[in-house]
Amino acid sequence: MDSKVFDVTIIGAGPTGLFTAFYGGMREASVKIIESLPHIGGQLTALYPEKYIYDIAGFPKVHAQELIDRLEEQAKFFDPEIVLGQAIDKVERLEDETIRLTSNTGEVHLTKTIIITAGNGAFQPRRLNIGNSEAFEGKNLHYYVRDMNQYKGKRVVLLGGGDSAVDWALMLEKIAAKVTLVHRRDQFRAHEHSVNQLKESSVEILTPYAPINVEASDKIEKIQLQEVKGEKIIDVEVDDIICNYGFISSLGPIKDWGLEIEKNSIVVNSKMETNIPGVYAAGDVCTYDGKVKLIATGFGEGPTAINNAKNYIDPKARIQPKHSTAMF
């Protein structure tokens, strides 16, 4: 057991968690970060490290991994303790109001407050279940792009109609021999600007079609598509398939902490407080009236949680802090 009692323990080391840790240091709080994955960065690192992000203030565009690297550098300015590969299974409040966290490895952590920044929680991709497609996962059937260079000069088919599918189609167009995007509807759910770029690109768009089978030997060689509400069937030769049907997420053990949950999100108020005293949430994991799920939103919610956690620990502490320009 780590006998040190931290002021703030942050659950989740994605972008919101990392910035929240930095801001905790700004308020001179002792901070520990606990992440269930073996690395920091959350979904950005695990699913699309090479993908560009366009809606971060001050960055016209930035690679997901670069953003995480910069956030890590910023967070480490105040030397938070970072624990990887642990999920918190149990939360208990002791007689002195200290909170005891027990992880899935049996390790015990002590803290005065908790800020949950677990993003969408644990996640698994929605799989392509046609024919024997599962046999080719990890060969040439993929659910996210870790290294764009593996698709150089390849015939790539993407399945899906959301932001991920459209964004990857546009990015891979530059290096793949051919990119085909298949969607079961005529309308895409992606951002309007991205859809307009798609229509002006060389990406082959097949709508409304749905995959019904694959032909394969060692790898998938063809994917068979059927027109939705029609009888037309076409075969498309492929080198790689990227399925972007989204992810099934779960709060995991967090849902058993006694928190108020609404549609797989933790309910908070304007102070980012949950229904449990001393426990806060920020980023995509939380919800309130008018909530918008963006990384940029989490960057504002994290400091709000820290400032109120600081006041919870010490009621004499200011909720409104000094500006950073006056601190260094």
UniProtKB/Swiss-Prot annotation:
Keywords: FAD, Flavoprotein, NADP, Oxidoreductase. Its EC number is 1.18.1.2. Pfam families: Pyr_redox_2. SUPFAM superfamilies: FAD/NAD(P)-binding domain. InterPro entries: FAD/NAD-bd_sf, FAD/NAD-binding_dom, Fd--NADP_Rdtase_type_2, Ferredoxin-NADP_redctase_2. It catalyses: 2 reduced [2Fe-2S]-[ferredoxin] + NADP(+) + H(+) = 2 oxidized [2Fe-2S]-[ferredoxin] + NADPH. GO terms for molecular function: ferredoxin-NADP+ reductase activity; flavin adenine dinucleotide binding; NADP binding. Its cofactor is FAD. It comes from the Bacteria. Binds 1 FAD per subunit. It is an enzyme of class 1 (oxidoreductase). FAD binds at T16, E35, Q43, Y48, I88, F123, D284, T325. Belongs to the ferredoxin--NADP reductase type 2 family. Homodimer. This is Ferredoxin--NADP reductase 2. It comes from Oceanobacillus iheyensis (strain DSM 14371 / CIP 107618 / JCM 11309 / KCTC 3954 / HTE831).
